[in-house]
C-alpha cells in the first residue's frame, strides 16, 4: 500500500514553518496542535471520502477558489471572538495554501505535458521526503496524527 498523497509534505512543511514563528504563535499552536494539523491538510482532507461524492467535489471546488475571502472571514472571526482554536486551524490552512501555491504550477505543468500524473507526482514527492527524513513510506502513515472530533468540526464551521 502506498502512502496517502501529499500528507507528509504538508505535515513536514508545517513543522518547519513552526520553527520560524514567534513564541506567542507557537504557544497558540501547541495548545491547539490537532486543529493546526487538520488545517495543514486544507481541503485535501475532503478527498479521502468516496470518489465523486459531494464531499470530494467540495474539496475540488475549494482548490479552485480564491483563498483571500476565506482567510479574511476566518481572521475576522478570530479577532471578534479571540478564538485561538480557529487561529491555529487557519495557520495550518495557510501553510497548506502556501505549499500548494508554490508547488502546484510545476505539478500542473508536468501533468499537462503528460510527464507524470498530478497524484503520482505528489505521492513520489511525499515518498522522497519520507526517505530523506528517515521514514519508511510503506510503514509510516502521517495522517494518523489527524484526529477527528466533533469539537474540532464546530471550530472549523
Which residue stretches match the model-derived regions?
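Long, charge-rich alpha-helical interaction segments
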Residues: 137-157
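Short active-site segment of divalent metal-dependent hydrolases/proteases
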Residues: 95, 99, 103
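Short alpha-helix carrying the canonical HExxH Zn2+-binding catalytic motif
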Residues: 87-95
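N-terminal, motif-rich segments that launch catalysis or mediate targeting to/interaction with membranes
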Residues: 2-88, 106-142
Amino acid at each position: 500500500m502506498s502512502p496517502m498523497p501529499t500528507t507528509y509534505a504538508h505535515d513536514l512543511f508545517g513543522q518547519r514553518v513552526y520553527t520560524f514563528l514567534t513564541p506567542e504563535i507557537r504557544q497558540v499552536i501547541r495548545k491547539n496542535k490537532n486543529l493546526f494539523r487538520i488545517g495543514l491538510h486544507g481541503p485535501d482532507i475532503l478527498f479521502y471520502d468516496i470518489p465523486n461524492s459531494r464531499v470530494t467535489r467540495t474539496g475540488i471546488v475549494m482548490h479552485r477558489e480564491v483563498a483571500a475571502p476565506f482567510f479574511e472571514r476566518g481572521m475576522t472571526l478570530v479577532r471578534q471572538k479571540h478564538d485561538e482554536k480557529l487561529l491555529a486551524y487557519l495557520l495550518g490552512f495557510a501553510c497548506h495554501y502556501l505549499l500548494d501555491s508554490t508547488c502546484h504550477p510545476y505539478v500542473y505543468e508536468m501533468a499537462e505535458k503528460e510527464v507524470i500524473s498530478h497524484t503520482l507526482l505528489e505521492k513520489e514527492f511525499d515518498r522522497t521526503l519520507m526517505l530523506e527524513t528517515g521514514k519508511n513510506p510503506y510503514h509510516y502513515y502521517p495522517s494518523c496524527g489527524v484526529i477527528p472530533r466533533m469539537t474540532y468540526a464546530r471550530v472549523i464551521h
